[in-house]
Amino acid sequence: MNQVRCFNCGNICIKNGKTKAGTQRWLCKECSATFTNPIDNSTKQFVQFQHWLFSKAVQKEMSGAGRSFRRKISKFWEIWPMPPKIESPMNVVYVDGIYLSRKACILICCNEENVLGWYLCRDENSRAWEVLMQRIAAPAMVVSDGGHGFRKALKRVWPKAKLQHCTFHAFIQVKRYTTGSPKTIAGIEMYMIAKDLLMIKDMEQAGHRVTRLINWRIKHKTFLSEMTRDEKGKLRPMHERLLKAERSLDRLVQQNTLFTYLDESLSYGEELPSTNNRIEGGINAQLRTMLRNHRGMSIERRIKAVFWWCYFHTPKPLSASEILKVMPTDRSISKLYKAMNERAKLEDSIPTWGDAIVWSELHKSDSFPACFWD
């Protein structure tokens, strides 16, 4: 049985009648304080909110259907779940971004089991990647699809980590240029070279694919050098899309990011991943399913829904009661920003060296005439 303790001294209390409304009154024998102990259902309501968000259930099917349920869970939409700080280094992590609108992107980092961090930004850029990565210990290898600004952030925050570009995304990039059914011999061969990247198992096969790529450029040199004029009369390569496809693979080979997963010094006897499927299928797909099940939410609530999903898939999420105590809310964040702005205005208004009024410039303290003053 749960014992009620005094809010003042912490000692065990006894029952002391009831109020006019019928609420149980409690008395502390030590300090003689009397009080009521109302039941707080916030934790139970938060658990209901969590179950609804991560399921296919519609609001009508929840207890307190419709408006009552929305009214009960509205306060939980004000909470911002914060990512943990990961201090233990890991062998492999995956990074990717999921766009919720044109100007809302959430960057996510995970390993094989858990979500490690997330960050909201307008689009993928080096500064946003740096903020995400600074809270996570540097891994041995990072798998990425080549998001904008990630290589720059990787050099700054995790300079010793090796980068593995997702081979499936490399293939998709080539397919975007050649299409799935190319009509030219050069296009068919380039498509097959890119497709074979998904089946490389050792460095010997990797070297063979690189040789095929070099030989492809030599074999079709005359064909690729053909020029044409655009609508403005300027000369352009006739097979520009094929050249872009070849350059996309050549760039990855030159950067040594296409076959990092074959490096035995990083594997420790285990097979390293060559694709970003863990985060694409294991996280992004589930996030899109959740947003589709609860479609119609505002962009702010969609962002927080993704945050909640990521938080409850971290290594050690807090309990519901602890979350309600420690996580920041819209109101607390607004209060913090308001205090920071007021402090900045105050600091700007205080005169600095050389800006303040000097008393002696406006008053005479001796009997010399004013004409003697500078």
Can you annotate each of these PLM segments?
Residues 145-194:
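Conserved beta-strand -> loop -> alpha-helix junction used to position metal-binding or nucleic-acid-contacting
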Residues 54-63:
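Short, charged amphipathic recognition helices of the HTH superfamily
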Residues 6-9, 28:
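Short cysteine-rich clusters marking metal-coordination/redox-active sites
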Residues 23, 27, 34, 64-160:
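RNase H-like nuclease fold core
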Residues 11-14, 36:
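Short functional micro-motifs and their immediate structural scaffolds
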Residues 25, 32, 37-42, 48, ...:
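Acidic/histidine-rich catalytic cores and adjacent linkers
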Residues 99, 148, 172, 283-284:
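Short hydrophobic/aromatic residue motifs in ordered secondary structure
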